Amino acid sequence: MQDKLKVLLIDDHPLMRRGIKQLVELDDNFEVVADVSSGTEGISVALQTSPDVIILDLNMKGLSGLDTLKGLRAEGVDARILILTVSDAKNDIYTLIDAGADGYLLKDTEPDTLLEQIKRIAQGEVILSDSIKNLLLERTHEDNPLDSLTDREMGVLRQIATGLSNKQIAAQLFISEETVKVHIRNLLRKLNVHSRVAATVLFFEQNR
């Protein structure tokens, strides 16, 4: 039997937190290891439970979602972190992605869609709401940072941007999964970003 994906919920709104928990627990693929109301508690619980996915609210009292995200990464928590919030402010999106978020969904996401996106993010895919993608397309740069990539690195990035996992990219490009990881490390370094989500953002920006 396949192990369930461990999910940690961090949201200071009790009703929202309870609703998301009940939704996630309807799917046998998931186990909610904890649901907490503050970022400080969330960091502590994450270190104790080693979740696969953390669903994090942005606008929380006390430690903000951004500071919680930074704290989780600073403590070495390698869970996939999905921001689930009502905010679609551009600055919030850019800042959170740069800080190491693996996905960004709005709270008006359909329940079935949310469950599917949690599965995808756990598999290493990039998750962004369609409205978020549209916002990213509006951002402009004078220089194209993608020009520094080799053809192969660009091919890998193009696959990342479609939401494929490393294993799927390897199959698509007929290369090993380890080679995919090497290309990803190189392209992240060249683009001066720290996550595949941030690299995807650049891809969308330059391919309007």
From Swiss-Prot:
In-chain residues carrying the UniProt-annotated modification 4-aspartylphosphate: D57
InterPro entries xref list: CheY-like_superfamily, Sig_transdc_resp-reg_C-effctor, Sig_transdc_resp-reg_receiver, Tscrpt_reg_LuxR_C, WalR-like
DNA-binding region, residues: 166-185
GO terms, biological process: phosphorelay signal transduction system; regulation of DNA-templated transcription
Domain of life assignment: Bacteria
Residue stretches making up the HTH luxR-type domain: 142-207
Keywords: Activator, ATP-binding, DNA-binding, Nucleotide-binding, Phosphoprotein, Repressor, Transcription, Transcription regulation, Two-component regulatory system
Record-annotated Response regulatory domain positions: 6-122
GO molecular function: ATP binding; DNA binding
Reported function: Could activate the expression of a formate dehydrogenase operon and could repress the transcription of the fumarate reductase (frdABCD) operon.
PANTHER family, A to Z: NITRATE_NITRITE RESPONSE REGULATOR PROTEIN NARP (PTHR43214:SF41), TWO-COMPONENT RESPONSE REGULATOR (PTHR43214)
Protein name according to UniProt: Nitrate/nitrite response regulator protein homolog
Organism: Haemophilus influenzae (strain ATCC 51907 / DSM 11121 / KW20 / Rd)
